[in-house]
Amino acid sequence: MRAAWLIKMTCAYYAAISETKVKKRHVDPFMEWTQIITKYLWEQLQKMAEYYRPGPAGSGGCGSTIGPLPHDVEVAIRQWDYTEKLAMFMFQDGMLDRHEFLTWVLECFEKIRPGEDELLKLLLPLLLRYSGEFVQSAYLSRRLAYFCTRRLALQLDGVSSHSSHVISAQSTSTLPTTPAPQPPTSSTPSTPFSDLLMCPQHRPLVFGLSCILQTILLCCPSALVWHYSLTDSRIKTGSPLDHLPIAPSNLPMPEGNSAFTQQVRAKLREIEQQIKERGQAVEVRWSFDKCQEATAGFTIGRVLHTLEVLDSHSFERSDFSNSLDSLCNRIFGLGPSKDGHEISSDDDAVVSLLCEWAVSCKRSGRHRAMVVAKLLEKRQAEIEAERCGESEAADEKGSIASGSLSAPSAPIFQDVLLQFLDTQAPMLTDPRSENERVEFFNLVLLFCELIRHDVFSHNMYTCTLISRGDLAFGAPGPRPPSPFDDPADDAEHKEAEGSSSSKLEDPGLSESMDIDPSSSVLFEDMEKPDFSLFSPTMPCEGKGSPSPEKPDVEKEVKPPPKEKIEGTLGILYDQPRHVQYATHFPIPQEESCSHECNQRLVVLFGVGKQRDDARHAIKKITKDILKVLNRKGTAETDQLAPIVPLNPGDLTFLGGEDGQKRRRNRPEAFPTAEDIFAKFQHLSHYDQHQVTAQVSRNVLEQITSFALGMSYHLPLVQHVQFIFDLMEYSLSISGLIDFAIQLLNELSVVEAELLLKSSDLVGSYTTSLCLCIVAVLRHYHACLILNQDQMAQVFEGLCGVVKHGMNRSDGSSAERCILAYLYDLYTSCSHLKNKFGELFSDFCSKVKNTIYCNVEPSESNMRWAPEFMIDTLENPAAHTFTYTGLGKSLSENPANRYSFVCNALMHVCVGHHDPDRVNDIAILCAELTGYCKSLSAEWLGVLKALCCSSNNGTCGFNDLLCNVDVSDLSFHDSLATFVAILIARQCLLLEDLIRCAAIPSLLNAACSEQDSEPGARLTCRILLHLFKTPQLNPCQSDGNKPTVGIRSSCDRHLLAASQNRIVDGAVFAVLKAVFVLGDAELKGSGFTVTGGTEELPEEEGGGGSGGRRQGGRNISVETASLDVYAKYVLRSICQQEWVGERCLKSLCEDSNDLQDPVLSSAQAQRLMQLICYPHRLLDNEDGENPQRQRIKRILQNLDQWTMRQSSLELQLMIKQTPNNEMNSLLENIAKATIEVFQQSAETGSSSGSTASNMPSSSKTKPVLSSLERSGVWLVAPLIAKLPTSVQGHVLKAAGEELEKGQHLGSSSRKERDRQKQKSMSLLSQQPFLSLVLTCLKGQDEQREGLLTSLYSQVHQIVNNWRDDQYLDDCKPKQLMHEALKLRLNLVGGMFDTVQRSTQQTTEWAMLLLEIIISGTVDMQSNNELFTTVLDMLSVLINGTLAADMSSISQGSMEENKRAYMNLAKKLQKELGERQSDSLEKVRQLLPLPKQTRDVITCEPQGSLIDTKGNKIAGFDSIFKKEGLQVSTKQKISPWDLFEGLKPSAPLSWGWFGTVRVDRRVARGEEQQRLLLYHTHLRPRPRAYYLEPLPLPPEDEEPPAPTLLEPEKKAPEPPKTDKPGAAPPSTEERKKKSTKGKKRSQPATKTEDYGMGPGRSGPYGVTVPPDLLHHPNPGSITHLNYRQGSIGLYTQNQPLPAGGPRVDPYRPVRLPMQKLPTRPTYPGVLPTTMTGVMGLEPSSYKTSVYRQQQPAVPQGQRLRQQLQAKIQSQGMLGQSSVHQMTPSSSYGLQTSQGYTPYVSHVGLQQHTGPAGTMVPPSYSSQPYQSTHPSTNPTLVDPTRHLQQRPSGYVHQQAPTYGHGLTSTQRFSHQTLQQTPMISTMTPMSAQGVQAGVRSTAILPEQQQQQQQQQQQQQQQQQQQQQQQQQQYHIRQQQQQQILRQQQQQQQQQQQQQQQQQQQQQQQQQQHQQQQQQQAAPPQPQPQSQPQFQRQGLQQTQQQQQTAALVRQLQQQLSNTQPQPSTNIFGRY
């Protein structure tokens, strides 16, 4: 403390000197002394570090500390300790720059090298001491946290090598036994530190670093939030916690696992979670909802990206850039290199989307399930490899899967897939919904593939269902309907099931599901109503391929069920979803899956008879099928000559009508194909897979047996085709492909065996069977291409079948199809090109030239021979002939070709349209075309002639046209079927037909050419048939409505393959031509229609693509007018899945396909709508602004499946808009976008806020809710696909809308409130935020405007809040917070723009601060929003700070440093003195401010401030009580305060309500002057009384001559400005003898007595060190003259007599507030001073004596003088010392009705916390004081009042009691230091005795006291004797002087007596104080005299001798009064 005082005085001295210089240099003492202290500390630290640093030999400080320290190190440590304590004192006193000092402390630690644990351990307490200061700065806390986390991580890294260190430490240290038992309890939560805590070396380090880190976490979490920094290397991107391997809450704590520790850990975990959320928010720039783990917007973006990748991928080909690997990389990224969090959140959404994509009817293709299974299998393998190590990455998938299944761990995606089944998977609820059925079948197929690829575990699925109770079962038997829905069902699904769930209680349902005991004849008795859905499975001996399943049975099944599709699933509709899934999901029929099969059987059927019956049902249907396959008469090589393999007629199973009749007449014991299929489709998919697996195995065995020569039986091609159909129907796609490839591999051996047996089937059987195989493989080409090995097998097998015909130009249609497929395989798969290039490359071009060459139509008109081949055409199946010869004759004879073509067409068009016959004729023609290539041109020509029949014979084939009426609608279907089969068999190219026949015909009709309409109608019918893919069942049972369609599924598949090969241009040509025809206004149409143009197509809209319903439309649609029919055909074509998919994919790649001069802009847009939304009505163009309505409709109907369509529509609109209308269009798009958001907000769905809460990780909710998959969430991604000009307009409109919502007036008017809430709810939507942020990308010119707009909006919100506009209701306040959050999120999205500009940074920082200051957002009302604002502010501040730390140029460093300081100053100024929890968090972001002392000032009660800012009295002040009121708070620098000195600069009397009054000479003063010896008055200047007496200089042996010096100089008034120049008095010579001894005694010895300069006195009062050594003790002589010349009186108080000699009353000071808290040091009691008197600077040194005097009342003082006199004569009685008790008349007389101004605020700087209440015990300390206890005064310990020449009347104010408390700065530390300010120590408001005070003492007296305190009582007695002897000697000398000058002698003698008594009194007081420090306080008088007059004093001292009293009074009267210089005031 003394050192700090000296530093302060030195600083002030040099500052004063520099003021006098001409060139003034202002030095900041804070920074200057911070640098001095830190520099010195650093030097000492370097010396210590050198010692503790491990030496080259590796001997660290550990070993070296055992020996004695080197001297220089010991000195350095001592210096370090002292200087560090001094720094701590100065830091707490506010004398240092706190920020700089803490930064230096931090840098010291950062410079400690990793190995220097000794040094770290030595310095760690320093860090802990300042930890409470560090957490007040987030910047410093962040750096400190980085240091702690890195050190802790280093300690953990070294744990492995730590054991040896523990041993060595224990061997060298004596400590190991004590800490060893403690770590187990303290480190239980954190096992990684267990070893470290066992080590005495590391234990304190771990605890210390952990403590600091946890302190930062609790007190300054902002320092640990993830941050990004653009430049600064020290403010790194990330969080300090990134470096810590465990959470801070798991770090060790010393208290073990106590309840308190657990409580702290819980709080730590809570804050950790908040830090995580805040960090994620900063990472995404607060752009999305931070509460959700999977942010909706981000996840939606990922999902849409995945969908876009899937849509753009071509699954028909495989090459490097379009393979499954590339698809997987585009969807999941390049391998699992992302962190686990991303895998869990984003991958879940992607996996769910893949499942949806595979299941949804919004996309098409059976390949989707296999693609998803393959993708997930690859992804799973990647993650497995990542987890198990790269060594397992190359393992087989089976090993990985079996490993994962053998262990209890599920496959990676099991949970996600189960969640998908719980929430999003389709289920059967509505029997009328076709889409629902399709999606359910797709789901079964998907999970069939997932189970096959080990991505989904059926076993674990079943176990989960059982554990959850989803498959509750009771008694054995079929499972009854579940009485409850699946608890995991999603809410929306529960709503959908509402209707069915009510039926679940119906007992009849469970009865209807029972299996009849006689189920052995289940399939023979089809009339029974209880045909169970849960068909039994085969026992596990069946090892088939996996099987998807199909919903089941109708209650009343007729033999040919008419409503098959609806009926098969009847019972399932009432079942919970998981019952449906468990029933149908197939399980692979392998040995490893036997457990799952048995488990499924038991779960569904129990273990009794019903399970056996279920098994038996499967066996029965399998037996029936095998009976058909193995019946006699099947293809035996010696009996099959009369059978045409492709058209068996009698044995067909493909639904011929005649065949049906014949079969019904046969005995029922032998099943028909229809019966088998009817039974088959009633099975579940699981059972269907089992059946087909066994049957296909049987067929394969037959063929293998024949190939090996062991059998003569071959299965018929039709039988194989039938099995193909069954497998396809059961969705056993993988099994179907495997079966086909196995058959294909056997075909070459079968062909060789047929040759060996010389069978007639040579060359036909294998090619016919191969054609069926090719048809299947072509149909599932996208599935086949996923497996390269299978592709290679297929290619080799096909080459083996047709190798003999590769070089022939002719061949059967089957061979043509096989060659064409080989060509397609080769060109679509780069893998095959690489493998078979040499073999097939030459042949490839030949195939292209023969099969895929364009053909021109023939226009021949030859002589027609009506009888040519008429018999063959009438019954093709009954005739056998060789195609080769017939083909050759047709090739050579054009007339025969012409006749054959005309006759064939005549039979097709004019016959009775038997479907089978049409099919047979078409196949015959196809076979002949294979052998006669020229027929292709004829077919094309004749079709052109028919379609363009209006061309008047220019197309040829006039004979046919004369006999066929093209307008006859009855043959259109037959002709269309005929053409379709020709195209399927590669006789015609679909493109050629479109180019040559269809387009000309349609355009002719569109141009209204005469008679063109019938041909155009025929063209439409053919095109419709060619573009549609009718999916007929294997057995056509709809006998009542015969339709002409393609009978063989083989041909249907081949036709579909032809559709896939067509180029995109041809498809668009057809669509445009039909559209133009439908739009044309046709003249003379012979057809009328009653319905509207859009109604007819709607009939088809809901009907799906079933071709069998075509007959029902012949009346309603085909007889309509041509334009209506054309529209119907166009819509029907567009409704074909493959057409829509091809068009959309093509348009996405090149949107110019619809840019055609034939189409107008509106037509192109309508055609686009038809392509995009074929099942929806076209837009109505009516209404206002139809363009905007259309755009709005596009945006409103958005969902994830229609993103492509919406984007294409808008892009087409933009492309077709001319430049002059572009602005209008862009504005319409922008406004429509905003309207969509407004409507979304108004609907109450509040999709923004709702959706943000939806995607939780709960198992019961989907990864993305339906709200997020559609509507406004998708607007932003859609706009992002459009040109940037659109985004700019949308951004502008959004900004305008934001501004509309900012004027949120008070909610007084309902309409205004509604508008406000509407706007607010719109603007609070997260999707809207996403939209604006999306548009901002690349829109820099818009960013500035939007930022400015947002700034004004946020400002408006804050202003509205200030105006209390949100306090009326909670709802507006909530909306305001949402709107504010939205705007801040928008700003966050543009934060890089804000940070680029210093001005914008400052503006936004101030605004963000204003948000918090105004209370708009605080921690209590909305903590999430508060942390957003806080983190934004933190990023802005740190971003400014960061730049100056970076490695950029010096100039810009300074500039950025300046910018940072300016910003910090502005924020600090704005913060001001405001106090709240929220603002404390903000203060942490700013640099630590310099500490100041606060002084509270007063003003008269009722003061007002006028318009000019001047204070005036209030109007009603006359009637108000007089007094003072608190006015302002003044800040004073700690460097301006000097203990023991009263500088005039900082403090002003006016601050304390004093009023200047003129001093009146009191009557008592006049009377006293009359008592003077002189006959005249000798007034002297007041300065005379401030000077010490001119005493002679002090010598060792005072010579006699010097005694006259005081007399010589006595009359001279000493100069006021040189108090030290006065000669020493004789009093000094008295003390000479003791002084010599005292000088040699060390000052520190007196500390034992508690009165040394470094300690406080016994009552908490310390001696200021600056006064202990004062050079001039001469002021002792003025002891008697205490009356000050200034009188300060309270208002209305009667002034006491005595005038100028009354003691000056000390003015009241207002208390200070918010002083920095300091710990209470021992021996220092908080007290309250009773008065402060100011000193003139010139009077400083003369005041010393009074500061040294123990404060006693004047009466006592007189008594002491008497005692001193008597003692010298041996007359002193000790009993008289304590006799006097002041009478009550000394009490202060205050005016009635006024309460004294009392304050209990402890105002000292250092002795205790600011505002400490004074303990009441202080009021009873047994020391008397002249100050009245009734009116204690407030004192400011940090300022001194300047004394003015004239007195101030102190205005008395009401009681103003302060009870301010604050916490200590360091609760863990108590410095054994004394406060700096001693004389200003506040004392009790109850009137602490002045005698308690240990006042300032002269150096001689100080030494005297030190000696007295040091020695024992005997030495003290000796001292007293010596002092008495000296007193007698000096008294004699003084008497000689007095005899020479009597007046001077009396004065000197009185002073000597007074001094002697003072010494004795001090001695007694010290003894009493030592005795009373522990003694209880005694009551003290309640009143003491404030003003004492000498006359009055005489009457009060009645116990004294009258003579002595008169003598003293005479001496006093001889001396003029002088001002009091005791800064304690009068005692």
From Swiss-Prot:
Family: Belongs to the Mediator complex subunit 12 family.
Positions of post-translational Omega-N-methylarginine modification: 1746, 1757
Keyword Transcription: yes
Annotated Low complexity bias: 1241-1258, 1815-1830, 1965-1975, 1983-1999, 2008-2021
Name of this protein: Mediator of RNA polymerase II transcription subunit 12
Subunit comment: Component of the Mediator complex, which is composed of MED1, MED4, MED6, MED7, MED8, MED9, MED10, MED11, MED12, MED13, MED13L, MED14, MED15, MED16, MED17, MED18, MED19, MED20, MED21, MED22, MED23, MED24, MED25, MED26, MED27, MED29, MED30, MED31, CCNC, CDK8 and CDC2L6/CDK11. The MED12, MED13, CCNC and CDK8 subunits form a distinct module termed the CDK8 module. Mediator containing the CDK8 module is less active than Mediator lacking this module in supporting transcriptional activation.
Superkingdom to which the source organism belongs: Eukaryota
Chief location: nucleus
Residue positions where Phosphotyrosine is found in the record: 13
Protein species of origin: Pan troglodytes (Chimpanzee)
Biased composition (Basic and acidic residues): 549-563, 1297-1316, 1605-1618
Modified sites of kind Asymmetric dimethylarginine: 1746, 1844, 1865
InterPro entries cross-referenced by the UniProt entry: Mediator_comp_sub12 (IPR051647), Mediator_Med12_catenin-bd (IPR021989), Mediator_Med12_LCEWAV (IPR021990)
Pfam families found in the cross-reference section: Med12-LCEWAV (PF12145), Med12-PQL (PF12144)
